[in-house]
Amino acid sequence: MLKNDLIVVVTSVGTEEQALDVAHALVRSRRAACVNIIPNIHSVYRWKGRVCDDGEMLLIIKTLASQFEAVRETIHKVNTYELPEVLGYRVDMASPGFLSWIEKMTALPKRKVAGKAKTKTKAKKAPGKKAAPRRKG
């Protein structure tokens, strides 16, 4: 997988507040271009020896493969689950315009350099003085 490959990351959270926290953290930090929040999903799973049946919210995160680890880390920091689900899927086909938009939205802005760029200039000789002779050899 190339670092500029489009991926979709899927995760689930227990509350709308957590969903918004994850979504805003990812988009603000430019780790994701877009996060869809799908409310009212129902998950049935086995955890610590028992079958659980919970309401959750599903997040669909659009980003680049190069951002996967940062997305995973953000989800683990914000999500309150002991073992958050973080699944990444490569997207095999997408419209070129959408892919270009994802690349722009996840690119970190270029830093502006304070002040002017320094350029080399020839040293000027003091008025009325001759330049020192060059040594040969």
Language model features with spans:
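Positively charged, small/polar-rich N-terminal and surface patches that mediate targeting and assembly
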Residues: 1-125, 129-137
